[in-house]
Each structure stands twice: as C-alpha cells, then as structure tokens.
Amino acid sequence: MTQIHPTAIVSSTAEIHETASIGPYCIVGDNVSIGAGTKLLRHVVVTKNTRIGKNNEIFQFASIGEDCQDLKYNGEETWLEIGDNNSIREACSFHRGTIQDNSLTKIGSNNLFMVNTHIAHDCIVGDGNILANNVGVAGHVHIGNNVILGGNAGVHQFCQIGDYSLVGGGSVILKDVAAMTLVSGNPAQAHGLNIEGMRRKDWSKETINTLRTAYKLIFKSGKTTEEVIEELTQDFLPQEPKVQLLIDSLLSSKRGIIR
C-alpha cells in the first residue's frame, strides 16, 4: 500500500506506485506518475506532467516539473521525465520543456543532484552524473554520462557537455565541453584530460596514453576540425574505441569546443 502522509496533497490524476512514499506537506499535481520505491521525503512539490521512475529520493523544498522560465512559454502542455535511482537534494528545481524544442526535459538514472541544482527547460541529462551545490544549467543543454560539475558552475543555453568530463567549481561554460576533458575558469578553458576520472574508472594506461595523444591533436596541433576528425578516425579509433567519444564531441558541437 502506498504511504501517503495525511498532510500531503495528491491529485486524483496522479499515479503513485504502491511501494512509493509521499512525505509530510508534499504536493503532487496532475498527470504525475511516481515509480516503485521512489520517496518524496517532505515539502516536495511535483507540479504537473512529470514522470518519475524507480527508487529516486527527493529531498525537502525540491520543485519538480514546474513551468519553465522561458519568456516564450505560454502554458503549453510540456513534460519532465526522470529515470531511476537519482538523489535529488534540497531545493533543487527541474523545469518542464517547451514546444520550441521537444516539449520535454529529460533526466537519466543514477545521478546525484546536490543542494540547489537548477535544470532548466529542454535539458537532457544522461546517467551517472554528479552536479554539486548551486550548479545552474540553462535551457536546451545536453549533459552526457559520468560528468562532474563542480559547485556554483553555470552552463549557457544550448551547450553540450561530453561524457566523463569534469567542470571545475565556479566555472562559466559558454561553449561545448569535449568528452573526457577538464575545464575550469570564467570563461572556462580546457586544462587537459580528466585523468583522475579515468583512473577511477580503472581505464588502462594504454587507453589513457592514446587519449592524451588524441587530445594534443585536437587542442594543440593547429589543424582544422575536419583534418583532426579524419586523423582520429583513421589512426586512433582502430586502436582505441573510446576515441569515438572525442570524435562525437567534435561532430555534434554547434557552439564550438572550449579550448
């Protein structure tokens, strides 16, 4: 039987799994679904049109599925989706999408969103990420998998942040972050590969050394992007599949790569 505290307010159109729990003073609005084992601890607001998966834990004063802050938004029916096994800490805010994009903000699984993280409209966040306290992510941003954003980092609209990258605390991201790179500063600049992150994932020395050489080709050779992609594809990719992450970053970038 679903555990719903007597002080909680839950819409009649909400679908709450029998193993989910809704704590004191929570508000769950229309067209919300909450999956098995998910916990809304206390004082959590899930406004509307939100699908939350399994085994998430959402802490007090989080605002989930609220109307976005885009001035073009005019009350259209848009959505927020959250995957499984996420920890969403105090005062986080996740907004629904806009019809100017895909009408959807999408959060993956196994992420940690620390206190006061903001995810704006139409963002796509992958799996296994850590966003530290007070990170602000503007609209239409795409964050890959296994990314770390340090506290108080800010990300400009439409930026992409590649897999396994590390953004230093307080950084301002104005362009795209290539996969596996370490960036920091205001505005952020690249400072090499996220070597420590690779070691924590138990990547081999051979893999890391190959990626180091690939990094130098991208950032220090002076060659055009087209030349770099061709060389990475022909000379690096056959010996190291993870080079594909760097190639994908270059191919998908619309704002240019942080250098």
UniProtKB/Swiss-Prot annotation:
UniProt keywords (A-Z) are: Acyltransferase, Cytoplasm, Lipid A biosynthesis, Lipid biosynthesis, Lipid metabolism, Repeat, Transferase
Q: Which domain of life is it from?
A: Bacteria
- Locations listed in the record: Cytoplasm
Instruction: State the pathway, as annotated in the record.
Output: Glycolipid biosynthesis; lipid IV(A) biosynthesis; lipid IV(A) from (3R)-3-hydroxytetradecanoyl-[acyl-carrier-protein] and UDP-N-acetyl-alpha-D-glucosamine: step 1/6
**Which transformation does this protein catalyse, written as a reaction?**
a (3R)-hydroxyacyl-[ACP] + UDP-N-acetyl-alpha-D-glucosamine = a UDP-3-O-[(3R)-3-hydroxyacyl]-N-acetyl-alpha-D-glucosamine + holo-[ACP]
GO BP annotations listed: lipid A biosynthetic process
GO cellular component: a single term? membrane
A single MF term (Gene Ontology)? acyl-[acyl-carrier-protein]-UDP-N-acetylglucosamine O-acyltransferase activity
Its predominant location is cytoplasm
> What EC number(s) does the entry state?
2.3.1.129
Recorded hits in Pfam families, A to Z, give: Acetyltransf_11 (PF13720), Hexapep (PF00132)
Q: Which SUPFAM superfamilies match?
A: Trimeric LpxA-like enzymes
Q: Which family does it belong to?
A: Belongs to the transferase hexapeptide repeat family. LpxA subfamily.
- Assembly and partners? Homotrimer.
The record's function comment reads: Involved in the biosynthesis of lipid A, a phosphorylated glycolipid that anchors the lipopolysaccharide to the outer membrane of the cell.
Q: What is this protein called?
A: Acyl-[acyl-carrier-protein]--UDP-N-acetylglucosamine O-acyltransferase
